[in-house]
Amino acid sequence: IVFDISDPMGESTCVACGECVQACPTNALIPASVAQNNGHLDVDKIVDSVCPYCGVGCQVELYVKDNKIAKVEGKDGPANHARLCVKGRFGMDYVSHNHRLTVPLIRIEGIKKTPEIDVDPDNPLKHFREATWEEALDFTAKRFRTIQASTGSNALAGFGSAKGSNEEAYLFQKLIRTGFKTNNVDHCTRLCHASSVAALLETIGSAAVTAPVINCLDSDVIVVIGANPTSNHPVAASFIKNAAENGAELIVIDPRRNGLENYAGHYLQFTPGSDVALLNALLNVIIEEELFDRQYVEAQTEGFQALSEHIKSFTPDNMSPLCGI
């Protein structure tokens, strides 16, 4: 394997996605999990699934042996077309990791909760004892009822998981609101994405993507701002890189280098926190120089005149000292 002609792997642009392993026709390259088994892979079944790591929705084939995932390969789905990133291909071993909880544990009586206690994940039974599900649920419910009775329902709160489905999120908030009788329910998405959901709904009518990311392969210009697909959505980033290599104009707007700027024709490294100033300056130029489809704007938008008046003072000259561009 040659990485960037002669660069060592760690210094090259290799992202360890394992595509070379999946494509290798001679089995000269095989996953470590297979190599540890003398290069032989005898599986009980192959299960079709979807990678849980990010929102791209890559379809995968899980090769299962003795109820453990022995190997993962990309499936030709609409989002990934058989591609996977390093997490999707090599990061599924957590499923059978020995640090995972397989039975309920209850803290041993007399062992206090203090930051000084260092729980050994290889031997949690120093601080906890195994319990049945019935005992654990009864124990938890009793503690919840005690807190409710002594300090009120608002002393309780629930925090949902981004790994759950929409249906699971709905059931979770219903449990907190109707069972715990409190509105103290939250979720990481509320902090990260709620503002963008509201803004996207108001501006374009949809709070989700309106086209598959693979469509970037048919785009002339791609603008990436406020996103780090290289780390957060690596398979999506691979299609963006392909598009740029095939002639698409890639514009990356970000105060932090994330690797995608290496493929960009323009990289705007603005001052952190000055996104709005930069975008208003771009709006100013687009409107003042009439670089927009007037017929479309008149037919499909509202409030354009007010926007035009609002951004008149946000000229590039005025915004440049703020955003550093």
What are these regions (language model features)?
Residues 290-304:
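Short helix-loop capping/hinge segments that flank enzyme active sites or metal/cofactor-binding pockets
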Residues 258, 293-294, 315:
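Residue-level signal for threonine
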Residues 1-289:
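N-terminal export/assembly segments and adjacent metallocofactor-ligating motifs
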Residues 4, 126, 297, 309, ...:
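Short, flexible active-site loop motifs that bind/organize anionic cofactors or intermediates
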